[in-house]
A protein has these predicted regions:
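Short loop segments and helix-boundary regions at transmembrane helix junctions
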Residues: 34-116, 213-224, 241-244, 267-268
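Transmembrane alpha-helical segments in multi-pass inner-membrane proteins
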Residues: 199-250
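Short juxtamembrane and helix-loop transition motifs at transmembrane-helix boundaries
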Residues: 4-13, 27-38, 55-65, 158-166, ...
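Transmembrane helix-bundle core of multi-pass membrane transporters
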Residues: 2-17, 88, 96-155, 277
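Generic alpha-helical transmembrane segments of integral inner-membrane proteins
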Residues: 23, 27-31, 72-80, 106, ...
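Helix-loop-helix "hairpin" substructures at the membrane interface of multi-pass membrane proteins
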Residues: 25, 136-208
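Loop-to-transmembrane alpha-helix initiation sites
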Residues: 18, 66-74, 93-97, 135, ...
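Cytosolic-side transmembrane-helix boundaries in multi-pass membrane proteins
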Residues: 246-279
Length: 279
């Protein structure tokens, strides 16, 4: 089975594209996911991943690359959510729920207008084995930009993630870094859509990060471990999907979930918690 997968990598260009794309998305998704779970923004990640659907649908209708429409609508959704929840009367989860459900409904209607149920299935659940050269290179370039941004602004992102009040008192522009993270999240959601689809993007973002959180004692270690786990889950999931002829995107997510489940019971932090409970 492994030899067949290796032979496929050597002989099939589409599988080479899929492997490279899966690795890149696993790495960048794991890195960004650390900031998402530390800020308690998992629901925001889910919202943006669904909100890109209208942009993808419009891109199909206009015959342009789906990255363009998806990024525009992802940024629009994140801006709307941030603006609505700035009202003290409206809670954060309410703003997110209203926005992402509205964008999702609009996207489904637009896909219906385009008369493309096959494309809708691929958008919702991903089709990494169909990644073209152009899509792969866009994914690589966008991911490099995201990783470079995290590296350059690591310290202020760290401060605003752990203690935004302290960061503000130190003169850090908290709102700027919030919007910066929203842009980063949107870019990653759009690139990950090819791998697992809009439905499962949030799992690819938060599961490796949550697993790394069980082991790491610093943000740098957490990011490195999360990226490694994301890459590992992506490769194993692709191998399982290709070998058994099942959805590779879903296989990637389930592999990542299995790694989390194992870590949940054996990680040092969990062992310490169990000892504390016994005492």
């Amino acid at each position: 089975m492994i030899s067949e997968f290796i032979d496929g990598l050597l002989n099939f260009h589409f599988l080479q594209n899929a492997l490279i794309t899966a690795l890149v998305i696993g790495i960048v998704g794991g890195a960004v996911g650390c900031f998402i779970i530390l800020r308690g923004m998992s629901l925001m990640g889910d919202a943006i991943s669904h909100a890109v659907l209208p942009g993808v649908a419009i891109s199909f209708i206009l015959g342009i690359n789906f990255f363009i429409g998806a990024i525009i609508f992802g940024l629009l959704a994140s801006t709307m959510i941030t603006y609505i929840k700035s009202n003290p009367i409206i809670k954060s989860d309410t703003a997110i729920g209203i926005t992402f459900s509205s964008f999702l409904a609009l996207g489904i209607i637009l896909i219906g207008v385009a008369n493309s149920s096959t494309d809708l299935f691929h958008i919702l659940f991903g089709n990494i084995l169909a990644v073209q050269d152009m899509d792969m290179w866009i994914t690589i370039i966008v991911s490099l930009i995201v990783l470079a941004t995290i590296t350059i602004f690591f310290r202020p992102l760290l401060l605003t993630s752990f203690d935004p009040i302290l960061a503000k008192s130190m003169g850090v522009k908290v709102s700027f870094y919030h919007y910066l993270l929203m842009v980063i999240l949107t870019l990653v959601a759009v690139t990950a859509m090819q791998s697992v689809g809009t439905i499962l993007i949030v799992a690819l973002l938060i599961t490796p990060a949550a697993t790394a959180y069980l082991y790491a004692h610093s943000l740098k270690t957490m990011i490195l471990l999360s990226s490694g786990l994301g890459a590992l889950a992506s490769v194993l999931g692709l191998f399982i999907g290709y070998s058994f002829n099942i959805a590779a995107g879903s296989s990637i997510v389930l592999t990542s979930a299995l790694l989390f489940l194992i870590s949940f019971f054996i990680a040092p932090k969990q062992s310490g918690m169990k000892k504390t409970c016994k005492q």
